[in-house]
Amino acid sequence: MTPSLANFISSLTAGGLVVLTIAVALIVISRTDRVTRF
């Protein structure tokens, strides 16, 4: 595995974790908050 490929995979994993964390937070907030903001 080349270093650039390893960096790409690690950045992809980090980005996926960030997106997953934001998605979970949004779901929790939307379930606990009954006021529709959209």
Curated annotation (Swiss-Prot):
Listed GO CC annotations: chloroplast thylakoid membrane; photosystem II
Assigned keywords, A-Z: Chloroplast, Membrane, Photosynthesis, Photosystem II, Plastid, Thylakoid, Transmembrane, Transmembrane helix
Topology class, membrane: Single-pass membrane protein
Primary location recorded for the protein, binned into one broad class: plastid
Pfam families, alphabetized: PsbX (PF06596)
Membrane-spanning ranges: 9-29
InterPro entries: PSII_PsbX (IPR009518), PSII_PsbX_type_1_subfam (IPR023431)
One example of a Gene Ontology biological process annotation: photosynthesis
Record has Signal as a keyword: no
Function: Involved in the binding and/or turnover of quinones at the Q(B) site of photosystem II (PSII). PSII is a light-driven water plastoquinone oxidoreductase, using light energy to abstract electrons from H(2)O, generating a proton gradient subsequently used for ATP formation.
Quaternary state and interactors: PSII is composed of 1 copy each of membrane proteins PsbA, PsbB, PsbC, PsbD, PsbE, PsbF, PsbH, PsbI, PsbJ, PsbK, PsbL, PsbM, PsbT, PsbX, PsbY, PsbZ, Psb30/Ycf12, at least 3 peripheral proteins of the oxygen-evolving complex and a large number of cofactors. It forms dimeric complexes.
Protein name: Photosystem II reaction center protein X
